[in-house]
């Protein structure tokens, strides 16, 4: 049996003596450790009284209902990152950037608890992060460090809190999967250089909204539903959890395409996912796993953000299917 590789060992080998990489390794280690604590809170479910309840009457900075556990997760991550070389934290739960370390060389964007609306139903939720380099001499306005196209990311990943606590991570050299070993307390490398199959017969979308979609997306789904007798010439399965980290992990495991389009409803014109906190980190992971990610037409990682809480339509997964969807536009 081959020797198990822990996250700590993997990061040490990857970083070596490079100070920039060491900073990234410290930040990812901190996020992973915070994630273990968040996973424990999620696992206790209704035993943790009030954590699944809506917090106040005002939505979070992204416009979504904020649960108590969203805030607790953000606090856990913020506390974990304080000793690391992270200058600022951008969070889906906070309107403004959160200053951490004035001498830091990183800025990190995080969705502390993606899918928190599913907590009551015991569905997998998770934490998504994006890491960008930061230089105070260059970025005199810290917001400008966050407001860069996703191609500038040096690392990204997500933790999925389900039957197992999973870390899917990239450092620009492929996409790796780590599993938290509850006996040793370590994250252990489970899959290296994940590759999403280019072809698929599986899509994930909330099909109940089809009546609100623009014609290109409606036409794509109609052709999938027509199956082997239709223009696609093959039968499709639909899978939709409604928690993006769970849907994403399925795609990294067995392929498929995830679709969250904009639609005609007020507030849904650009979908509901955030470019900086969700689309960019997942797009980086996807491309490093030989998949593709677009807003339906344009590569996600090339898009210039115009607001730290900007929403964007998102299509990611099996490359050929993402390109097929783009052809409908």
Curated annotation (Swiss-Prot):
Its EC number is 3.1.3.11. Homotetramer. It comes from the Bacteria. The keyword Lipid metabolism does not apply. Belongs to the FBPase class 1 family. Pfam families: FBPase, FBPase_C. GO terms for biological process: fructose 1,6-bisphosphate metabolic process; fructose 6-phosphate metabolic process; fructose metabolic process; gluconeogenesis; sucrose biosynthetic process. Keywords: Carbohydrate metabolism, Cytoplasm, Hydrolase, Magnesium, Metal-binding. Mg(2+) 1 binds at residues 92, 111, 113. It catalyses: beta-D-fructose 1,6-bisphosphate + H2O = beta-D-fructose 6-phosphate + phosphate. Its main location: cytoplasm. This is Fructose-1,6-bisphosphatase class 1 2. Pathway: Carbohydrate biosynthesis; gluconeogenesis. GO terms for molecular function: fructose 1,6-bisphosphate 1-phosphatase activity; magnesium ion binding. InterPro entries: FBPase_C_dom (IPR044015), FBPase_class-1 (IPR000146), FBPase_N (IPR033391), FBPtase (IPR028343), Fructose_bisphosphatase_AS (IPR020548). SUPFAM superfamilies: Carbohydrate phosphatase (SSF56655). Its cofactor is Mg(2+). It is found in: Cytoplasm. CDD domains: FBPase.
